[in-house]
Amino acid sequence: MAHKKGTGSTRNGRDSNSKRLGVKAFGGESVTAGSILIRQRGTSVLPGVNVGKGKDDTLFALTDGFVKFESIKRGLRNRKRINITAAV
């Protein structure tokens, strides 16, 4: 019989670094061309007018202007789209 408690092992003890996803420029905000608007995984928000999409689904401004979100009906679910309206 052991007179000392055996050391157990665990499969925990690690965690991944946060990826800092989310909206970076909110509705009505002024942005410049090239500004990152949303970092996302997949296209939960679709690119609209004057908005580009990177290979990692990041949305960015193609022109200077103001951020405008809109809801669109697509299929059975509503989707969001982000546009850049021209700065006046």
Curated annotation (Swiss-Prot):
Residues 1-23 are annotated as: Disordered. The keyword Transcription does not apply. The keyword Ribosomal protein applies. One of its GO terms (molecular function) is structural constituent of ribosome. Keywords: Ribonucleoprotein, Ribosomal protein. It comes from the Bacteria. GO terms for cellular component: cytosolic large ribosomal subunit. One of its GO terms (biological process) is translation. Belongs to the bacterial ribosomal protein bL27 family. NCBIfam families: L27. This is Large ribosomal subunit protein bL27. It comes from Synechococcus sp. (strain CC9902). The gene is rpmA.
